[in-house]
Amino acid sequence: IRYKGDQEIGAVSWARLRQFADGRREIERPRYEGDRQGRPFVVTADRGVLQAPGAGTDPNQLPEETRLVGHVEFREQNGMTILAQEATFHESSGTLDVPGPVTFSDGKVSGGGVGALYDRQLQVLTLRDQSRVTMAPGAGGGGGFTGTSKTMLVNRQTHFLQMDGGATIVRERETLAADNTQVRLTDANDGVTLMQLRGH
């Protein structure tokens, strides 16, 4: 358990723990629960590999970094879900670093790519390669789109998408292509208020 003053901000549980002489630990079915800035979240996986802070450390003391393997799921109470097969969770900053394929969903917005970093404090997801995003159509059947680019930044606080490198947007009646595309979403993330395309 980790505290900030008298307030509990994180706890970890597992089904089985093995500890080695070099301080390395392996845990089965790890579950990390945190609550920072009033935004509860949960991280789970099939297995976790971590390094103890020091010799003789209490097994319940949370490490700074945990490598997660198998069915990694990062879920925030306010809507963001990230799925991967491998990731590294940094406890103190609440960031999730994914080296391989990843998918995400946040209300009507979903997508994925290869390689990603999610910063909980900034509420920003960065997709590093083969990025894609989909907005589901509204109640009337309009307003939806799909987009692809090399890299993509999804800023949940400002409701903003930045697509860089061969950006393509496909809407109901048109396909748009540019080097870079910026998309501004509604506050509810259920529609587009502005779209800017730059370059060929």
Predicted features along the sequence, with ranges:
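Mature-chain termini and adjacent capping regions
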Residues: 1-200
